[in-house]
Amino acid sequence: MTDEGRPSYLKDVIVFIPSLNPDDKLLSTVRSLREEGFTRILVLDDGSREETAPVFARVKSECGCELLRHPINLGKGRALQTAFMYILNTYPACAGVVTVDADGQHKAKDVAACARALLDHPDSLILGCRDFNESGVPARSRFGNRLTRRVFSFLCGLKVSDTQTGLRGMSKRLMEAFLPVKGERFEYEMNMLIEADERQLPIREVPIETVYIEENRSSHFNPLLDSVRVYSVFASFFKSSGRVVSRL
């Protein structure tokens, strides 16, 4: 523990937050992470509107975050790849990264739990997994996540409680493994799971609090376009994998 009573191990883990058109929830998220004990927080502006610039300025000036920026919106997949490359080149001594959403859905204590799991199991992909049976989960989120989870399980033979979680922890070795993964937007995270399965990388789940603010209205997941992208990943996997055929 540090002198302030915060876990000293958190200084070895970088938190990465991709953000598009943020509001004050980004500031609240960063402040809570600072209070939890994280010292290195990296925020990427993925081509946000000009009027959100003051939020990013405050994240840097008031919270001491490092800022990266895409001049145009490239999507979450590209944001993650940009961050992985930056971290690998800039922080070669770090233990790894925990990715966090900018909309306030991930509690600092759960981010810390994923960081601890990352340090304890550096060869594993760490997933912070929500419980969709809890009350307060929007119906569309409950249905969509259950369906995606079942399709993923059928195709890959791998049970993952929360395939779409943005709270993930990975070591430098895993960042390097995931850099070539295809996908520019939310489908990239699904491809990460498939890549982990292909490489026989362990996936460890950390139960986290299920938080939906204003029924998830601030999410940038497009129910139509991003769902098509995610299920296109499944279609490609179906065509290329003999494991599925063997189970039919």
Language-model-detected regions and their locations in the chain:
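Short loop->beta transition adjacent to catalytic acidic/histidine clusters or analogous donor-positioning motifs
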Residues: L10-I14, R34-V43, C65, A95
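Short, well-formed alpha-helical segments that are part of the catalytic scaffolds
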Residues: N21-E35
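Conserved short acidic donor-positioning loop in nucleotide-sugar-dependent glycosyltransferases
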Residues: N21, D46-E50, L74, A83
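Hydrophobic helical membrane-anchoring modules
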Residues: M1-L10, R31, V181-L248
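Acceptor/aglycone-binding surface of glycosyltransferases and processive sugar-polymer synthases
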Residues: E66, I72-L74, R78-I87, A108-F186, ...
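Short beta-strand-to-loop acidic/aromatic patch adjacent to the donor-nucleotide binding site
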Residues: Y91-Q105
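Acidic helix N-cap motif at the loop->helix transition within catalytic regions
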Residues: K25-S28, E50-V59
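A conserved acidic beta->alpha catalytic loop
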Residues: D45-P54, G104
